């Protein structure tokens, strides 16, 4: 009979703990990771710019659908393999060195930009991805911190390296 009070109490404390942890995390964050590739910036930029092909090499994106342009900017709905749906809009496009896109969770409290910067180095290039994000929901902030704010960037850099048959060494 005591367990009927202990188990719900423990669950309530865990939920309260996540809420408090999320509330003390900053809503905004900036994260940058980079990777050296043995590819020309033009080759890497072309792959990143071709969003229709994203599901063929990304371990997280299942489907990409084009949406009507937003203020003259290309927009897509990207369905992740785990079910989340993001709206991505191209904000800046400077081939072959810079690509900036915004991402927002459809109907949700997550918003941010990803900036791809490609710098020639030797026979290849260094690609740096910077995420400037904002999560208003404290539970999202808590889970993002526990998961690692750089996890999505590292996954995309790993996918890029594998697409080109290279071993990822992310910095």
Q: What are the roles of these predicted feature ranges?
A:
Residues 3-10, 14, 23-26, 56, ...:
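Hydrophobic-ligand binding "helix-grip"
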Residues 71-75:
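Short coil-to-beta transition motif at edge beta-strands of beta-rich domains
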Residues 2-70:
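Hydrophobic ligand-binding cavity/cleft-lining segments
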Residues 103-162, 166, 170-171:
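Beta-strand/loop substructures that line and gate deep hydrophobic ligand-binding cavities in soluble
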